[in-house]
UniProtKB/Swiss-Prot annotation:
Organism: Granulibacter bethesdensis (strain ATCC BAA-1260 / CGDNIH1)
Transmembrane portions of the chain: none
Protein name per UniProt: Beta-ketoacyl-[acyl-carrier-protein] synthase III
A GO BP entry: fatty acid biosynthetic process
Reactions catalysed: malonyl-[ACP] + acetyl-CoA + H(+) = 3-oxobutanoyl-[ACP] + CO2 + CoA
Active-site residues, Swiss-Prot/TrEMBL: C113, H249, N279
Coiled-coil features, chain-numbered ranges: none
Subunit structure: Homodimer.
Localisation: Cytoplasm
Gene: fabH
Amino acid sequence: MKRSIIAGVGAYLPSTVVSNDELAKRVDTSDAWIRERTGIEQRYLATADESCAFMAARAAERALAHAGMTADDVDAILVATSTPDQVFPAVAVRVQALLGAKRGFGFDLSAACSGFVYGLSMGDALIRSGQAKGVLVIGAEVFSRLLDWDDRRTNVLFGDGAGAAFLRASTDNDDPARGILSTHLHSEGEFGDILFIDGANGVAGHPGTIVMNGREVFRHAVGKMAQAVEEAMAANDLTPADIDWLVPHQANLRIIEAMGKKLDLPPEKVVVTVNRHANTSAASIPLALNEAVQDGRIQPGSVVLMEALGGGLTWGSAILRM
């Protein structure tokens, strides 16, 4: 059976960096208040010229270059985002045009902060089914355009950016143990009102801003993500000792640390970027993955575990061997 191999990764972060101290000049907060509650020190915010599609395309170009591939090798483009530039066409087809890709197809998927894990699952399914040989999975967000700048419960948490992974079908020359081992997706709609955007493009004059019950999100996050991680390990007969790296959704340092402890993983096995990137929603996992690959922490053969929870509620996990 064909497996999906992550052949390349890439990322794009906006040109504007905003520290906590700079943010405190705009809203009623402080560096100490933000760090204590979230672990965030700064975030990247998109300029007017840095659209969701632009950032997604830049990340995709870098992932293709890292994989030694070109736009001609792309059969499908999947973009996980909650902040598309327009209702339609999809960000994915805008990316297709920006890359100069002439074949295949693209679509967006909306699973909030779980989006990249959902995208990996869809991309993996396309490759396993034989419908595609090369798939770009991208997480891209411009949450700064949906923030209520008077609500410090949310406006200190989020940042903008994009991360991408190029999946290719395995060949006879590949190590049969390499690739995406399994993905596990969940949702529970009854909790949709604890994290949402209170509007939509279809609501005249009200595109919406983020609304969040932080305590409830925290309460669900650790338990549900741990369940998804344990499910992934059990499906592959693995234990925490077999995991080389945990690449979690970068929402809050306290949640990340709690996840590591719950899984008995030492801090040095957990990739953390939330301090510099803040919460970039669907972009957070691929941004963190890219950093750990590029700096040499994640090597070929590394067993990598990903997990995320987002509005919906949606949550899930993916486990793979690089």
